[in-house]
Amino acid sequence: NDMLSNDLLYINQGDGTFHNEAARYLSYQSRASKGNDIADVNNDGLPDILSLDMMPDDYQTLKRTVNGFNYLHYAGDEEFGFEHQYMRNMLHLHNGFNNDGMIPFSEIGQFAGISATDWSWSPLFADLDNDGDKDLFVTNGFPGDIRDKDWTKIKASAAGSLTTELALSEMAPRLKIPNVVFENTGNLRFVRKDDWVKEVPSFSYGAVTADLDNDGDLDIVVNNINDKAFILKNRTVERSPGNSSFIRIKLKGSK
């Protein structure tokens, strides 16, 4: 959930009902949670959880934007019974089950190197280079960067004036930025690979992976606001067929 309301982690109770166990299983959460994905990032057979936020990935933008968190927020969470939230991507690593059946997740987003990707929406875990590890693709961008401190001052000064909400929104900077891809290098570490995908600034939201041309590697389809969709062709098998592993299954029936 975005901002005040906490994220929810519904665990199947085995009796046809689900119960929110986020407070027990997760030590803390992303604050302005956007998209999420669940995948086994370290190939231990257990599902890990990634939730995206909107923390800038460069120093200049970070200092130019509203952080969204201070001690008053922290104290408010304590006072009103909310779980603690921080404005960055969270990667919750599944540590297996303890004696009472609880899943003790560890949050490792900063350790893994994927905690800051700017205003992000859809994360996709997928083995993009066919090496057996799940890599990460993240969509980015927003038509109006309402985190910008100059814009927040303009909005505050316009209170009580005849300036319309539409006019104010059009004053916000356009956050048209490239999407991001990370290579899973093993040992719970990810490395940003700008050479894997051409850096095209966009307002990208939804995305999906599929082997569109049946060549054995996963392509990516990205949906954009006010622009054409992207189809990102994966050339892993084409460029390095000897170092690429995949399984092709052909079904043969009686008819």
Feature locations, PLM:
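Acidic, glycine/proline-rich Ca2+-coordinating loop motifs
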Residues: 1-255
